[in-house]
UniProtKB/Swiss-Prot annotation:
It comes from the Bacteria. This is Elongation factor Ts. Associates with the EF-Tu.GDP complex and induces the exchange of GDP to GTP. It remains bound to the aminoacyl-tRNA.EF-Tu.GTP complex up to the GTP hydrolysis stage on the ribosome. GO terms for molecular function: translation elongation factor activity. The gene is tsf.
């Protein structure tokens, strides 16, 4: 059996919202495998499906620039929120986002080689690092193209902690911005149910079945309950089926259709997604309770 470390318990607790002892028990039962431990907690009804935002832990800001039929969404990282709020950092972010929308590089390496008045974009980033005393880095970006009849919708939340960019066919810019606001707030994983892989469907169906059996439901109605729960789950993670944040009486797809539009694409950045940040005090708390 794998040794369960306090850091693992801390990570699972943060991801699932479970108590320390429940998290430790799940890790023991799954031999330290984080994904299996999460499934264990869900089967026991202790945790719900993890959202991407559960893993947010870095500083910086995101921004969006639109240049004709091209838009760019960019994340720039710093070591502290203090530097992220500084004018040199915010000025650099605006410059980086604008240049990426204009030059359309294929990756971060190409973006860093974009020519500027100071040499390259990488030189500008180094200069800002020197000004602020902290490492500043271009973490990621996405360049999005649209057709002439499409609309971009861009929305920044909390000054750029979350950025959402959508493309709608047919609808106007105001409708597209409304959908971008929804994406920022609700954080869908997929555009439609057709975008969810069969592997993901099978995985979720198995989790819901185990959860339902653990609740003691009669076996003859288990499959019906499972399909109902799976249907509800899909309506929560697919943009088209989600209740529209500004009018819960209609779905996002219905709202866009009412404006003579059609959903085409969306992308959402949350600063620090997928980066774990050291949490010394919390780790000590876990260690104390495990001993």
């Amino acid at each position: 059996m794998a040794e369960i470390k306090a850091a693992q318990v801390m990570q699972l607790r943060k991801k699932s919202g479970a108590g320390i002892m429940d998290a430790k028990k799940a890790l023991v039962a799954s031999d330290g495998d984080m994904d299996k431990a999460m499934d264990y907690l869900r089967e026991k009804g202790i945790a719900k499906a993890a959202k991407k935002s559960d893993r947010v832990a870095a500083e910086g800001l995101a921004d969006i620039a639109v240049n004709g039929n091209t838009a760019a969404i960019v994340e720039l990282n710093s070591e502290t929120d203090f530097v992220a709020a500084s004018e040199p950092f915010k000025d650099l972010l605006k410059k980086v986002t604008k240049l990426i929308s204009e030059n359309k590089p294929a990756n971060v390496e190409e973006a860093l080689e974009i020519k500027t008045e100071n040499g390259t974009l990488n030189d500008d980033i180094i200069s800002t690092t020197q000004k602020t005393g902290e490492k500043v880095s271009l973490r990621r970006f996405t360049v999005v193209e649209k057709d002439d009849g499409d609309s971009f919708g861009a929305y920044l939340h909390q000054g750029g902690q979350i950025a959402a960019l959508v493309v709608l066919e047919g609808a106007d810019d105001a409708t597209a911005k409304d959908v971008a606001m929804h994406v920022a707030a609700i954080n869908p994983e997929f555009m439609t149910r057709d975008d969810v892989s069969q592997e993901r469907l099978d995985h979720e169906r198995a989790i819901f079945k185990e959860e339902t059996l653990n609740e003691g439901k009669p076996e003859k109605i288990v499959d019906k309950i499972v399909e109902g729960r799976l249907n509800k789950f899909l309506s929560q993670i697919c943009l088209a089926d989600q209740d529209f944040v500004k009018d819960s009486d209609q779905t996002v797809e219905q709202y866009v259709s009412s404006k003579n539009g059609k959903l085409k694409s969306f992308i959402r950045y949350e600063v620090g997604e997928g980066i774990e940040k050291k949490q010394d005090d919390f780790a000590q708390e876990v260690k104390d309770q495990m001993n």
